[in-house]
Amino acid sequence: AIDKRIKCVACQVPLVSGFRNIQRLVRQDFLAPNRAAMDQDRAARFRGEPPAMVPVVDPDPLAVSALPTPDSWEWFSKTGKRRAPAWNNEVTLRSIEMLMEYEPSAHLERISPTPLLMVVAALDHLTPADLALEAYQRAREPKKLVLLPGGHFDAYVKDFETASGAARDWFLEHLGSSG
């Protein structure tokens, strides 16, 4: 949105509002304890201590994790492990705190006249589809929406050909071919 050297934008199962996303993913009664843990982590890092780590996923949806959805557990514990066997199930608590402050949709109206493609999964609960569709409505032309039938991780497996094909076609249309 800010760098006009960018000739086109494609986003797939986008996170459009970190704050609203966290409000959906984390139970309300967990927010205050999570905030307290983040405050303690920030103070510890200031003292030179290592950052607090939390699991990315956990089979228990009530346990502390960065991505507390069943499809996240399925993806990272099975598909992700198969594709990236060296992956460690941990992320800094600071990363979650920074996610809460990440608001890319604040710039959405300023992307135009750069062409925008949004690939949204209709059943996405990790980066909620309704938030992405709301953001798409706010975006100005030129824009295009591709709605996938599945959930968040289906964009990388079951619906990969559709998602990646849409991005490829978008880039070819707006960037041309180099061959």
Residue ranges and their predicted role:
Residues G150-S164:
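Catalytic histidine-centered segment of alpha/beta-hydrolase-like enzymes
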